[in-house]
């Protein structure tokens, strides 16, 4: 009888232990759920690339759709670059950028919004009389918010200007043309021009 009671008691103890472990496991799963939700929330609230870059871009105007490209023009404080090209930051009025991405219907094999490399991007800044006050070629470069074409500009007087980017196609960039792997589009043969008219520049209104 004692042996039977012992066996019964052992069985009950085993069942109780199993129940306790199951309850602990369920509680642990419940306790860990907020952590997963918290992680999801943190990911959702994380800044997108470039949002926390530490500088504020000012637009030259609205984005311009030209050919297979979407072109944005921005400017902000002069920057140091490696290697140093053009005007040093200390002698510059601003850093200007052409953000050039592929349009959704580009037919050149780029994904919509992809940076388009290998371009030659010339710029011209004209006063309202049509006189060119600055011109040159933007350089391909990377910043903390990604690749672009840019340059530090020499000192520029306050005024209202028309800014143009003249975009030439890649000179040594091949396209597949066969039926199996080829793309439908072809690179443009004449420079594409993205224009930003009536840009107002006031060096006393910026923080740098």
Regions found by a protein language model. Give the residues of each.
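Bacterial N-terminal signal peptides that target proteins for export
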Residues: 1-12
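C-terminal motif of bacterial Sec signal peptides marking the signal peptidase cleavage site
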Residues: 19-23
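Short, low-complexity, disordered segments immediately C-terminal to signal peptides
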Residues: 24-46
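Short amphipathic, basic-aromatic surface patches that mediate peripheral association
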Residues: 81-82, 95-113
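Short coil-to-beta strand junction motifs in C2/discoidin
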Residues: 90-94, 110-121
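Aromatic sugar-binding surface patches on proteins
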Residues: 143-150
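Short acidic/polar inter-strand loop motif in beta-rich domains
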Residues: 168-181
